């Protein structure tokens, strides 16, 4: 025994520890008991609230289901906590925990499956209504869902119109007054189709089916700014054309138009559009710029100089050898940028900024700084002109960046007595026609500019201010300046004809709805067709109508894959982020394509899924029939012959199809742009009686045909995808900026729309040396041919 150590001290320590443990266990058991009691009370409360819904005769709204699931999350968290301390539970409590876990699982399953189970019971209760009508399971569920906000994602050929029409009829069957229902379509033909279906299939002859145009007009009439006439989206491009014609004799306008046509030839790209910085630099390093004279030059500065000389009728040679210069081991044969043979003058355009630095992409991982190396080359070249007494005009890349290149060049040319002979206004416009042979391409951009400005609530004053204040590219500035002049004429024509345009009308209607909601008609049920096409102001108008009538419901049908009208102001995020606008919304996917053969569905699925901006879904074909997608390719390298080749092949194919098809079958010819359609249509003056239609892809949306020809699936400025429609020129009238990918994704959606018009045989036209990107993307589904087949394959 150790001297001085008492046994009482360790005993006291052990006793204290045991006492603390006993207290902690008691407190834990108390907490566990209270937690179990709380869980039981919560489950009992849930069961009480849900008791009236277990027979599925009453509908439990999404908000209440979400609240119930949040409460269950808390229950599961508590049960998880209790489960960690099973050893401290009494037998009775363990049995309660097991029972509560089962009850919580059951409640969660009930809430998660409620909509589906309710819908199936409602379908069963509505047998008399549905009868033998051919609806699939997803269509039936969409028709009977009773949520306040509903979105039906209806893929191409999935029975969208049939489902929407049935929803209107079903709502009436449930007791709604027809006048309390508002069904909205975007086109008159879609409105008429819905009316006819309601009357013929359901005996509803007085349905309130309208276009957005007629609804907006009715409400906008209450605005003091309203005028008698309203120009729709078909009339607006014609008014833009008239606006341009009024300015045709204006030399400044002609030069502005030419300036933009020249800028359209430039690809303004950003680094984020490339997989790596090196790929971005490679693009800048090796891209060529085409001039008005057809020559290819190495930079936009050289392009602008070449175009200026051409437009002022100054003869020049590009990179002509300076045979008089010294030969230097460090340099090849010296070839200055431009030589003016009539004057013996050379022009060098130096690729440096004000600090003497070259662009970053000049670097190729060399040990020598590229700016230093370039500077040495400049010194040697300048010395050659001094030594051999040759005249040299010098320009710089920073002048191009600062928009002073042409004024500086003009001044130096005049000082050297170079005669500048400017083109006449008509000659300038001829050059514009040469650069943009397809007028509908430019009209589409112009229409988009005005439409997007008004959709975003911008006036000409606002756009002018943005132009002064923002950091815009040269192309954006040139186009905005041009469009302000056209917009002024556009508004003058509207005023002269006592008209407003469609965007004005919607904006006026929205102002009325926000300030005088008491004057609005009350609708208990609002249904919208082609929801993917809705603009922000139209959506705000719908929200105002919903707010004007307590308890009103919204039912929308659309397809994010068919959002192709951004030029008219539609915003794809209105369908992608539907629940952000309408909380607790229900979503149903109609994923069966009843229109297209199996391989067309597979090809369209593949290309749609290449887009990043989309709803994830996989469309399945109802048909198991495999029909080849015929690809006609022009052979040879001479692309100037493509239009004539395509015209003859398409004419031959259409003639054969018309002769061999059944009387009730249709042929449809589609193109990204109208020009090849107009030429081909002249060959078939009786096309309507022949069951033949010629449509741009935009106009073809919502239609179908047994045989579809898609023209001009080629690359290039006027190809598909359109490389000339640089939507970044519209950034100045938008609230967000395009990043380049948005343009390609919409073009890809347009290709998807074209493919899915076809019920039987699909024919694509391309060039073997100028294939469209979309042809490359879908090539595994295509059957290449060199000559059209002359037999019609039965559906």
Place the predicted regions along the sequence by residue.
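Conserved helicase C-terminal RecA-like lobe
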Residues: 663-664, 687-691, 695, 700-788
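A short acidic/basic microdomain associated with nuclease active sites
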Residues: 310-330, 337
